Amino acid sequence: MRNENVAGLLAERASEAGWTDQPAYYAPDVVTHGQIHDGAARLGAVLANRGLCRGDRVLLCMPDSPELVQVLLACLARGILAFLANPELHRDDHAFQERDTQAALVITSGPLCDRFAPSTVVDAADLFSEAARVGPADYEILGGDAAAYATYTSGTTGPPKAAIHRHCDVFAFVEAMCRNALRLTPADIGLSSARMYFAYGLGNSVWFPLATGSSAVVNPLPVGAEVAATLSARFEPSVLYGVPNFFARVVDACSADSFRSVRCVVSAGEALEVGLAERLTEFFGGIPILDGVGSTEVGQTFVSNTVDEWRPGSLGKVLPPYQIRVVAPDGAAAGPGVEGDLWVRGPSIAESYWNWPEPLLTDEGWLDTRDRVCIDDDGWVTYACRADDTEIVGAVNINPREIERLIVEEDAVAEVAVVGVKEATGASTLQAFLVPASAEGIDGSVMRDIHRRLLTRLSAFKVPHRFAVVERLPRTANGKLLRSALRGQTPAKPIWELASAEHRSGAPGQLDDQSASALVSGSREVSLKERLAALQQERHRLVLDAVCGETAKMLGEPDPRSVNRDLAFSELGFDSQMTVELCHRLAAATGLRVPETVGWDYGSISGLAQYLEAELSGADRRVTPQSARSGARALPLIEAQLNKVEELTAAIADGEKPRVAERLRALLGTITEGQEHWGQRIAAASTPDEIFQLIDSEFGES
């Protein structure tokens, strides 16, 4: 029997083609194809040593990285079914996935470990430590029809479902996109805004480079427009993959000079509007702009424009080895130019969902994508709409009814419809249309209350940030909601622009230097050193209050003091859009240039405040980003409080320094004893004198 294990076949292909020493990933260090496959084989041995075998299930919840690729390949090498999970999901979604898969092992990292059962979770770092001490394992002998991996759908018709793909499926993706659409070669470098847990991103950043000898730029944090521009200027990718929302932001916020190396642009996830496609053509200097359509069930793109033939406003043509047809409501084939449901048939289509009894395909092997399209005489496919009520925002399918059920729990709301609306840039965003339950109407405070509740109960990408009040919802003659009529509405202002009276009347959030100036020019006789120390402390308070105030506004919290300053932004309910918006607002408040990435780099209100304070002071050395608290696993308390001690040293008088230094030396002798309770006592201290008293009491010094 020929071994059709895809991990083994990809390693064999790299060896035979001479790619082993060629870059596979820039992350930012170079990782070669040979290192990827060798690491995967060693990790396969680790999984075998831990008792995992063919047919077991593993849940992978890791950020994009070469390490995720190696762990995925290790599972495939051993015949283990790997489920890919979005690490940015709400903890309830992760709990569902753990129950759904009944995984023998959950592989994740850092704070996410606390979200899963201790008996099954393992930190990926531990696996890599073990892999460094073992030799590579052989590849399990498998047929091409063996289950390989599964990616989750967006859950538009109920709970998310995992589409199971086989070992042979990968090579269908490669034939369709790499060979027929993109003409990828080992010289190509890809950069994808879509993540690896997403079927689109998995192909872009994993299967395509490994199967063609090309390489990919990967980043553990979300790749927004500005991040993409930075990565592109550094690594010079030739193919840029994304979704329409991403590309709309690229055109608005970036310089075309950063993307001079790009030879083609690939868009998928939702239809690319003609206007945006034309803007992209101008921005990128006339290179191919390739729109297409794919699905989680198919595994990647099956209809696309190509580098040889592309047309703005069209999804392109069907790519071999796939077949498509358009089906009219009566089940007959729709003629040229007639709108109908898009059906697809081909070798990579998942035959079933995990834990789902209903078949995916017809008896003839056709999958109904639920996309409505039409095809002209020459085979060009044009997108019309979704056949169901699914909203596609940022290339993610969202079930609006899940959101609507939560919103209508609010007594002030009689009816609600959540739809995707188009911003002026061409990007899509969720908006909730609210019908008041009484003549009192719905004001901004009610909208903020709804927004806060949604942030605590849904994954961030499902939460609408725009709300509009309407007298009634548009409906058909038989009472069915006309979502299409709402999609054309002008977007309302985002919730964070609906400033409450509390915010407008002087709550923290806007920097000024009046208090600080008063300290310097105070009437009492103080030394210059004391004045400068007081100024530094006041600046720290002002900056922290500004960040906390802006964060509270965006969350709709009337009292900034109620917001946890050490909790990760993701745990507060921020998604990528909100994090970027916060950076924009802080830039306006401080007059600084605040990169969009610092919200992720510094992770929390406290961390971001430290960064801004250093920038305002003109410090030569940038504050080192630190991990924010996420769930139960937080920045070690001792480390956090030592940072506080360091900040307060500016107020130490010269005469006190020897005494303080001696006591801190005594403290060093107790570090190995792990006295975390002492750090908790420091947390309650607010001045250097209080901290010194704690040191005195701890070590018995007078």
Curated annotation (Swiss-Prot):
Q: Which cysteines are joined by disulfide bonds?
A: none
What's one GO MF term for it? ligase activity
Q: Which domain of life is it from?
A: Bacteria
- Give the EC number: 6.2.1.50
Location of O-(pantetheine 4'-phosphoryl)serine modifications? 576
Coiled-coil intervals: none
Do you know which InterPro entries this protein is assigned to?
ACP-like_sf, AMP-bd_C, AMP-bd_C_sf, AMP-dep_synth/lig_dom, ANL_N_sf, PKS_PP-bd, PP-bd_ACP
Write out the pathway annotation from the protein's UniProt entry.
Answer: Lipid metabolism; fatty acid biosynthesis
Q: What is this protein called?
A: p-hydroxybenzoic acid--AMP ligase FadD22
- Species whose genome carries this gene: Mycobacterium marinum (strain ATCC BAA-535 / M)
Lineage of producing organism = Bacteria, Bacillati, Actinomycetota, Actinomycetes, Mycobacteriales
